Structure formats: C-alpha cells, structure tokens
C-alpha cells in the first residue's frame, strides 16, 4: 500500500511538472491559414546600454519562440542597430556605456536567435554609418551580417546591389517569400538615405518580368515623421549622395505599380506618446493602387 501511495505521488508530481512547462502565453493565429511578418523597430537605445540589452534580447527570443505558432515567414528591422558605428568611447554618458564593438557584438548575438530558422532583412540606419551618425560611408554592418550567417537567406535572397563602398552586401537586398493565399511577395531593404543608383536598381528590379506581378514591400530607415506622418524632405547628415523620404517616394515608390507597403523607423520623440513614435499614411501610386506607408519606432517609449 505504501509503495502504491509513493507511486501515485510520483505520477502526480510528474504530471504537475509537465503542466508547469506548458507555455500558456504563446500566441496563435486567429486564422490558421494566415501568416506573420514580424517588424522590429530601431534597436539602438536597447543596444547602447548594457542594462537595456535584455529588452531587445527578449524581442528576438519571443520571435524565435513564435516562428511556428504564428507562421512567421520573415522578420524585418528598421535599422539603427547600434548608436555609434565606430567609437571606442561613447561621446557623452547619455549616448550609452558601451563601445561600438560591444554594441555590434550584442546585436549580432540577439539576431543569432533567428539564424537558420527564419529569413530577416535589416534596413541600415544613420547610426550604422560613420562614427556616430553617418559622417561617412564606413559601416561594420557587412562584418557582422554576412550572407553566410543565416542558411535561410540562401533560399530567399534573390537580388542585391553594392553598398556605398562598392561591396555587394545585404544593405541593399531583396528577399522573396510565398504564401498560398497571398501569392509571391518581394521584400526590398535599402541603405540609409539611399543613393539614386540604389533607387534605380530597386525600381528596375520590381519591373522585371520575374517580379512585376509580385506584391512588393519596401523597408527603409528614414521615410516618415511621427504625429503628422509627413514624408521627410530634409535631413542634416553628411553622408552623400542621398535621398530623403520624399525622394524615395518620387523616384521609387510612386512610379512602381507593385510596391504596396513601405515600412520605416528613425523618427521618434521621447515624450511617452505613441503618436509621436508611429506614423501612417496611404497614397496612390502611378498605377492608381493604394500604397500604405508606416513608421514604427517605439524605443522612445521604453520598449
């Protein structure tokens, strides 16, 4: 009898332990035939302080955990992976407490949770170039994000063009995903303040016979403001040649019949108001189709 009681208690404990390991907070799709694309806003303020880094680590960990339950086909990031691209000391305490190498190492490790599981594209930001904010074309991005690091890219990256230093990198790249209901989707990421030749490359790419019937998503770092959702027309960065949000619209988005969504980050005001860290507008392209344009940069809200 005593042995039976011990056996029953053992089975009960094993059952309770199994129940405790079930994740009751895992998210699921309302429509099992749908899919997800995850958008990560600018990471820079999570990355530049060691005590903020767990916030971004949680974002990529959560995404990796939900790849199957949310049918995540791609992850996109609006850029500014670091706050200073090339500094051995932060310029001022409010600009962080880590060197540039420590920032790049961390953000690379955080994205490592997604490697070989899901393809992702990053639109490099102004802080990813120069020393602190695009004083020149120097960037550590290709060093930390070579195409070889994620096996999913071999299946999905379909085009790329050279960066400002004449190197073929993922700063300007296109990724193709498919869905039985949506059909074929082309996602294009372009460098911060893209040059005319990059916009021409993207415009010609979406018009080719291979991609002209795809639904195209463009992700770029700087494009819309928050609050009133204006396309940006002027910025004070030294990096040249360049285009602002309005230039991207006029030279790439508006003339292209199949670009239907533009995503960006960059703009934020640290005043705890969501409407200052997000933006949205819809305009017609040359073919008369709606183009939805969204800015998302919630780092100023603390998460």
Residue ranges of model-derived segments:
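Extended active-site neighborhood of metal-dependent phosphoesterases/phosphodiesterases
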Residues: 87-200, 210-211, 273-295
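Bacterial Sec-dependent N-terminal signal peptides
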Residues: 1-23
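N-terminal active-site segment of His-dependent metallophosphoesterases
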Residues: 20-99
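Stable alpha-helical elements in mature extracytoplasmic
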Residues: 52-63, 78, 103-110, 137-141, ...
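Short catalytic/ligand-binding loop motif for oxyanion handling, primarily in non-cytosolic enzymes
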Residues: 47, 83-86, 128-133, 197, ...
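Active-site-proximal beta-strand elements of phosphoester/diester hydrolases
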Residues: 34-47, 183-193, 219, 292-297
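Active-site glycine-centered loops adjacent to acidic/histidine catalytic or metal-binding residues
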Residues: 42, 79-80, 125-126, 221, ...
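His/acidic metal-ligating clusters that form di-metal
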Residues: 64-74, 116, 164-176, 181-280
